[in-house]
């Protein structure tokens, strides 16, 4: 399943003075990620709800840990049920490593911060979270340097194995150096890392030539991507239940406008039209065990009352209201009972991992893919898209992100100014002053801003614009 080429690194040999023959190469990569500054910074980046609102809420770091665990579980499940289909076993820790780093390139303030930086960088190669992840791993982290500059840059990042880097490459596409506003958002990798991507692909493909319509995506990357979706659809919803932002009863009673928006978003990944009725059916199926249903022989609240014909309809309505009230009371348990929430989340994750299926690539097993069958895929997408539309797009959540767009834009403009380099740490300032052109300067500024946590970005902006800024003696 893995070759020496998969384990090859950009900088060889590594002169660290230690004989690590007893350590697995992918295990070394796992350790490098855990101890990296970029990995730690994820604790200061919001997942859905700002962590300052409650210690319970997930941040990018805890989300990544959950993705890593789910990815490892999927790999172990595939190894157990499909041990003869791949010509070897998948390395579970390699999949976990991909989970740890999958969000490491996200800027402050989530997708609004991403949009702000991409707009600022449209004439300089763009900005995209996955591309930034690759750049952090292969350039920005301060582990090793090349003996001679590669594509004008001697930084080698964490010098990870090629197969580890491949596990993070979700989009096999170079982002154009210059784009117009009408071109829209492009996912992929930056031109500055193209030479590294080409080397990684050559190592992993090991002579196999991709077909005309075939994209480069390894089995580990496929596992990480699905693990991310599972964590997103389950645990973000759990956070919403905890804070009382959503409840099962509210989801079951969603209006058609909300359900239509969810159906529209779910239709694209499902590659077909998803209907409102399907969404409602998913909710009924998921929540049927949570909301207590009265037994068939249970007493009705209206038992013993003689119902005249002229009030029969009103009585039925009253009983429906009482039934709904019971459902609502029961569903409130999700925000008040941690045992029930944990049971709910664990069961969903178990269903998804247990349902994963493999599509083996006979010619190049490294490019094998995993997927969920139709029913589970729909369940995942409905939960994911509903949380996105109902919670993440809610005014209370979007207000902070909207403000973040302006903060990131203001900071970028200030740093790109004639004296912007004076506002940055010494090491970044040195690279800015040595930049051969404005495009390289913009990328250095973008790297600095993208690495900020939410709090650091707000403090930095306050220093530039507010009378109530942090102390001037606090380090930049």
From Swiss-Prot:
It holds the Pfam family HD. CDD domains: HDc. The keyword Hydrolase applies. Keywords: Hydrolase. InterPro entries: dGTP_triP_hydro_central_sf, dGTPase, dGTPase-like, dNTPase_2, HD/PDEase_dom, HD_domain, PHydrolase_assoc_dom. GO terms for molecular function: dGTPase activity. Residues 60-233 form the HD domain. Residues 1-20 are annotated as: Disordered. GO terms for biological process: dGTP catabolic process. It comes from the Bacteria. Belongs to the dGTPase family. Type 2 subfamily. PANTHER family: DEOXYGUANOSINETRIPHOSPHATE TRIPHOSPHOHYDROLASE, DEOXYNUCLEOSIDE TRIPHOSPHATE TRIPHOSPHOHYDROLASE. This is Deoxyguanosinetriphosphate triphosphohydrolase-like protein 2. It comes from Mesorhizobium japonicum (strain LMG 29417 / CECT 9101 / MAFF 303099) (Mesorhizobium loti (strain MAFF 303099)).
């Amino acid at each position: 399943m893995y070759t020496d080429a998969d384990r090859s690194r950009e900088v060889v040999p590594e002169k660290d003075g230690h004989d690590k023959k007893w350590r697995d190469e992918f295990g070394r990569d796992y350790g490098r990620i855990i101890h990296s500054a970029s990995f730690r910074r994820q604790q200061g980046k919001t997942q859905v709800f700002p962590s300052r609102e409650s210690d319970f809420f997930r941040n990018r770091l805890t989300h990544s840990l959950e993705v890593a665990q789910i990815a490892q579980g999927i790999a172990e499940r595939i190894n157990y049920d499909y041990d003869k289909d791949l010509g070897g076993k998948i390395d579970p820790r390699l999949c976990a490593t991909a989970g740890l780093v999958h969000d490491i390139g996200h800027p402050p303030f989530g997708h609004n911060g991403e949009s702000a930086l991409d707009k600022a960088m449209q004439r300089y190669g763009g900005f995209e979270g996955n591309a930034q992840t690759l750049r952090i791993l292969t350039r920005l982290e301060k582990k090793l340097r090349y003996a001679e500059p590669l594509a004008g840059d001697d930084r080698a990042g964490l010098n990870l194995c090629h197969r580890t880097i491949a596990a993070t490459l979700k989009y096999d596409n170079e982002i154009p150096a210059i784009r117009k506003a009408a071109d829209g958002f492009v996912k992929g990798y930056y031109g500055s890392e193209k030479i590294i991507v080409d080397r990684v692909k050559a190592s992993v493909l090991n002579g196999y030539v991709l077909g005309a319509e075939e994209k480069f995506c390894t089995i580990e990357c496929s596992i990480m991507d699905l693990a991310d979706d599972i964590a997103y659809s389950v645990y973000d919803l759990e956070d919403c239940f905890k804070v009382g932002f959503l409840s099962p009863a509210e989801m079951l009673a969603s209006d058609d406008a909300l359900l239509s928006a969810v159906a529209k978003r779910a239709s694209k990944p499902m590659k077909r039209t998803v209907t409102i009725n399907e969404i409602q059916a998913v909710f009924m199926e998921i929540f049927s065990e949570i909301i207590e249903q009265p037994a068939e022989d249970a007493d009705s609240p209206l038992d013993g009352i003689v119902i005249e014909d002229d009030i029969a309809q009103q009585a039925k309505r009253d009983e429906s209201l009482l039934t709904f009230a019971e459902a609502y009371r029961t569903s409130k348990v999700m925000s008040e009972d941690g045992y029930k929430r944990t049971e709910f989340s664990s069961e969903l994750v178990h269903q998804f991992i247990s349902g994963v299926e493999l599509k083996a690539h006979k010619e190049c097993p490294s490019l094998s893919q995993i997927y969920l069958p139709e029913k589970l895929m729909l369940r995942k997408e409905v939960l994911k898209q509903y949380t996105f539309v109902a919670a993440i797009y809610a005014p209370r959540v979007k207000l902070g992100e909207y403000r973040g767009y302006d903060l990131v834009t203001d900071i970028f403009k200030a740093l790109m100014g004639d004296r912007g380099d004076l506002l940055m740490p010494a090491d970044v300032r040195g690279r800015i002053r040595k930049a051969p052109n404005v495009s390289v300067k913009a990328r250095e500024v973008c790297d600095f801003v993208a690495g900020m946590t939410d709090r650091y970005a707000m403090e930095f902006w306050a220093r530039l614009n507010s009378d109530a800024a942090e102390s001037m003696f606090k380090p930049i």
